[in-house]
Regions:
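VWA/integrin I-like adhesion module and closely mimicked acidic/polar interface patches used
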Residues: 167-204
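Bacterial N-terminal signal peptides
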Residues: 9-18
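Von Willebrand factor
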Residues: 46-164, 169-170, 197-203
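Bacterial N-terminal signal peptides that target proteins for export
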Residues: 1-8
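Surface-exposed acidic, glycine-flexible loop patches that form ligand/cofactor-binding
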Residues: 28, 40-48, 81-86, 146-157, ...
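Acidic, polar low-complexity linker/tail segments
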Residues: 18-54, 60-68
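Sec-exported extracytoplasmic/periplasmic mature domains
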Residues: 71-86, 99, 124-131, 143-154, ...
Length: 204
């Protein structure tokens, strides 16, 4: 009990000293620097790193039994980035490809959502996608992501394209995946993939 009283007394004494010094009521003695009036330096705020993620999801018919798990995997990537420490300035965009309901003149690719920090909207758009036949032009999807997304101009920005599908990436008759990836790399964009299928497959 005496120890607690002593600790409390010391704490109150420290508080009183702190208040007394901060008011500057007493002038410092001659020749003694007025250290009480020195303003402590404030730590500089750490700039938030921009992270831009473009999701390219295969919505062709062959993904019918796989698309739900693909969406879950992609959303797990979004959550992992969003929960990083320190928290990044995260924006996510969405592209679908390989769906017969899309314009064939574009190579059956469509930008569903530009880069946005509204992750609720990303979730709604992602999980609303459905499958419907089609040709899977992976290179065209990567190219659309590079050309149509409003990528950050910040030199510190991390720019990523995630392609998720289950078919060979060689179906595009106009653009090869190598060409699409090289063009992305030239713009400091990293291209990653999630394969939806058996691990023993040649496409894995």
């Amino acid at each position: 009990m005496k120890t607690r009283a002593l600790i409390l007394a010391l704490a109150l004494a420290g508080l009183c000293i702190s208040v007394h010094v901060s008011t500057g009521a007493d002038a410092p003695a001659a020749g003694v620097p007025d250290t009480a009036r020195v303003t402590p330096s404030q730590p500089k705020p750490v700039a938030t790193q921009p992270v831009d993620l473009a999701i390219c999801l295969d919505t062709s018919g062959s993904m019918s039994g796989l698309i739900d798990s693909a969406k879950q995997k992609l959303w797990a990537v979004v959550n992992e980035l969003a929960s990083a420490t320190p928290a990044p300035d995260l924006r996510v965009g969405l592209i679908q490809y390989g769906n017969d309901g899309l314009d064939p003149t574009t190579g059956w690719v469509e930008r569903k959502l530009g880069l946005t920090s509204d992750l609720d909207e990303v979730y709604n758009q992602l999980f609303a996608l459905t499958t419907n036949g089609g040709q899977e032009y992976v290179a065209r999807a990567i190219t659309l992501a590079r050309e149509s997304m409003e990528w950050s101009a910040d030199p510190r920005a991390l720019k990523i394209v995630f392609v998720c599908g289950n078919e060979p990436a060689t179906q595009d008759p106009e653009i090869t995946v190598s060409q699409a990836c090289e063009a992305a790399i030239a713009h400091d964009i990293i291209v990653n993939s999630i394969y939806c299928g058996p691990p023993q497959s040649d496409e894995a």
